[in-house]
């Protein structure tokens, strides 16, 4: 998975069934809701199936059509232009210093946080209950069923070629 950050299996392999201290297998069903190990196991399952990448692509395809994104983009353009207008051009100046100064100004202004929250409200929130949650619940259900099946020992196969014992006929 090449998602540009945070991809990978995320511990969905055999390590997801062991404690981080190298202990024995963990039964996810025995962990309480909210347990960090359970959360890590579930997140690993979601990552290994590409669900986060799918959500990211879905949201990214939708984001630039939203007014909050367009508004934030315009404000960012204006902020950068204003910041650069205040800078004195110095050819030997390090571009990284200019980038860092701009980044610090954006963070200190606090404008981007509110804009990102509005974008999230317009893009992510509508998809949360109707698209994302059902997919997450389905994967969790499949994972827990597989864990339960793996925890139940298989019944020995019935011997072939033997007739089952005849039912006793009590004539009393």
UniProtKB/Swiss-Prot annotation:
Key words of the record: Cell cycle, Cell division, Centromere, Chromosome, Cytoplasm, Cytoskeleton, Kinetochore, Mitosis
GO cellular component, one term: kinetochore
Gene: BOD1L2
Native source species: Homo sapiens (Human)
Main location group: cytoplasm
Function: May play a role in proper chromosome biorientation through the detection or correction of syntelic attachments in mitotic spindles.
Classification via PANTHER family: BIORIENTATION OF CHROMOSOMES IN CELL DIVISION 1 LIKE 1
Pfam families in the cross-refs: COMPASS-Shg1
GO biological process, one term: cell division
Domain of life: Eukaryota
Entry's transmembrane regions: none
Name of the protein in question: Biorientation of chromosomes in cell division protein 1-like 2
InterPro entries associated with the record: BOD1/SHG1_dom, BOD1L1
Biased composition (Pro residues): 154-172
């Amino acid at each position: 998975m090449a998602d540009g950050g945070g991809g990978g299996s995320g511990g969905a392999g055999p390590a997801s069934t062991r404690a981080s201290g190298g202990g024995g297998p963990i039964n996810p069903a025995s962990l309480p809701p909210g347990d960090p190990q359970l959360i890590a196991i579930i997140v690993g399952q979601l990552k290994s199936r590409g669900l986060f990448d799918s959500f990211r692509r879905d949201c990214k395809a939708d984001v630039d059509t939203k007014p909050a994104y367009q508004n934030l983009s315009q404000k960012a353009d204006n902020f950068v232009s204003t910041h650069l207008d205040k800078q004195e051009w110095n050819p030997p100046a390090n571009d990284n210093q200019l980038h860092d100064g701009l980044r610090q100004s954006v963070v200190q202004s606090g404008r981007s946080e509110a804009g990102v929250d509005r974008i999230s409200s317009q893009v992510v929130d509508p998809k949360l209950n109707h698209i994302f949650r059902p997919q997450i619940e389905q994967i969790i259900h499949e994972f827990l069923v597989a864990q339960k099946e793996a925890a139940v020992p298989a019944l020995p196969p019935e011997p072939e070629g033997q007739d089952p014992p005849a039912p006793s006929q009590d004539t009393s």
